[in-house]
Design a protein with these regions (language model features):
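Short, small-residue-biased leader/transition segments that mark boundaries at the very start
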Residues: 2-6
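C-terminal catalytic/substrate-binding lobe primarily of soluble NAD(P)-dependent oxidoreductases
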Residues: 38-281
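Rossmann-fold dehydrogenase core element
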Residues: 7-22, 42-43
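Short low-complexity, flexible loop/linker segments enriched in glycine and/or proline
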Residues: 7-12, 33-35, 144-145
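Short, conserved acidic/polar surface loops in the N-terminal third of protein domains
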Residues: 7, 29-31, 58-59
Length: 281
């Protein structure tokens, strides 16, 4: 919301500002625009599913910035329904889903920033939720760290110096950039849409599967970094090449999705569309 407040100044300067062009947010929002353009007259529900089926072999580590990751999963969850936000206790809504090329995983409802934009930009949408998968070992470690105060963002005094517990914890955990050579398995990230097309109910699932070891062989990084970095490059390319040219500040769902979707296939993140997928209750 704070970044959107500078939209007018970008318009006056004739500059295109692009927010959130990783995978989620980023690609998932482009998936929504693509579904709206090609598959639906009305989108009624969106479920964003982020599954990491990878294994790095450590007892506990995070796949991206530990401070951001642990804050995200320890915060209250929320989703958009019937025109307003519904807030829930952290990790209190759990579902199981069988992900293509990964298998069945437990996933939990979290707040995620792309919901804020999609709720405004997808006309008539009734519900938007975001789910992310976590294993039981990860959740047990996280709960223990929370119980002893290491997830706190409140500074404390230690040996005469001010430290933030979660920032201290970040220094103790494995650096996510070192996980590439030891991480095996795949990610599966996508969106399930339901709605109406030509007067009939329709549901589709648009998703990408990415292999950790294939990513490492290509760029010496695991799939979490790959699925974040490639979309950032594509978003930049869209703006630099003039394919996305609209002075102001926008999210990725506010542009024509077609060239971005074509670029995903070209640059290592091919996607699939499945009709009538298993829905999340």
């Amino acid at each position: 919301q704070r970044q959107m407040c500078i939209r007018d100044s970008f318009k006056e300067a004739g500059i295109t500002g692009l927010l959130g062009t990783g995978f989620d947010p980023g690609v998932t929002s482009v998936f929504a625009a693509y579904a709206q353009k090609h598959y639906f007259d009305e989108i009624h529900t969106i479920d964003i599913l982020d599954c990491n089926g990878g294994d790095h072999g450590y007892p506990f580590a995070t796949n991206f910035n530990p401070e951001i990751n642990l804050r995200e999963v320890s915060a209250p969850g929320s989703y958009w329904e019937n025109g307003h936000w519904v807030e829930i206790p952290p990790m209190s809504i759990k579902r199981e889903y069988n992900f293509d090329e990964v298998g069945e995983k437990d996933m939990y409802l979290l707040h995620h920033e792309e919901i804020e934009a999609l709720a405004k930009n997808i006309p008539g949408v009734k519900r938007i939720r975001f789910f992310m998968t976590f294993g039981q070992s990860y959740l047990t470690h996280m709960k223990c760290l929370e119980n002893v105060g290491l997830l706190s963002t409140t500074p404390i005094t230690f040996n005469g110096q001010q430290i933030v517990p979660i920032q201290f914890l970040k220094e103790l955990l494995p650096d996510p950039s070192t996980l590439g050579p030891r991480t095996v398995g795949k990610t599966n990230i996508g969106c399930i849409f339901t709605g109406i097309k030509d007067g009939k109910e329709r549901s589709i699932y648009i998703y990408n599967v990415c292999d950790h070891q294939e990513c490492y062989r290509e760029v010496e990084s695991q799939a979490i970094s790959y699925t974040t970095g490639v979309p950032a490059m594509i978003g930049t390319m869209m703006v630099v090449n003039g394919l996305w040219n609209k002075p102001g500040v926008y999210t990725t769902d506010e542009f024509d999705p077609d060239p971005y979707m074509e670029a995903l296939n070209k640059w290592g993140l091919p996607w699939k569309v499945i009709e009538n997928p298993v829905l999340v209750d």
